[in-house]
């Protein structure tokens, strides 16, 4: 018996659609995208992140390697020293809604909604010293989703 192999057909990835065009929406695509039929699009909701020490800190350490994580939300993250110690310290990390999302330790990379490393300075941190990480709004445009 002869075996026939059928090639890919247009829109074969569509299994079903809701009535009244509920499955379709017009979006603006980020420039430079090479979109493939059937691939998933994701909205760019968060842009870059920047970090800064808050004026009035006693400790003179810095915040470095700041970036927005995959689950970041736009807004200002608060990083507050809760356990000071000589040449180290523990900081509570709060998201823009005021929810503690983790604890950062001086000298160790923090990874989560936002990513950063706190460095020790010549003067140790005291309770209440703080940093902020501001995650900017994204473009709101869409690009091909890449989970990697």
Predicted regions and their residues:
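Surface-exposed, low-hydrophobicity beta-strand/loop segments enriched in small/polar/acidic residues
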Residues: 1-148
């Amino acid at each position: 018996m002869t075996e026939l192999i059928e090639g890919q057909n247009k829109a074969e990835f569509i299994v079903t659609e809701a009535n009244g065009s509920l499955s379709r929406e017009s979006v603006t695509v980020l420039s430079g995208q090479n979109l493939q039929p059937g691939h998933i699009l994701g909205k760019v909701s968060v842009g870059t992140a920047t970090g800064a020490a808050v004026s009035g800190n006693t400790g003179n350490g810095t915040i470095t390697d700041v970036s927005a994580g995959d689950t970041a939300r736009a807004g200002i993250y608060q990083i507050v020293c809760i356990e000071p110690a000589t040449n180290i310290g523990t900081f509570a990390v709060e998201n823009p809604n005021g929810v503690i999302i983790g604890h950062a330790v001086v000298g160790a990379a923090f990874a989560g909604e936002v990513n950063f490393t706190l460095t020790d300075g010549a003067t140790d941190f005291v309770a209440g010293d703080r940093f902020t990480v501001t995650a900017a709004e994204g473009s709101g445009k869409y690009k091909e989703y890449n989970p990697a």
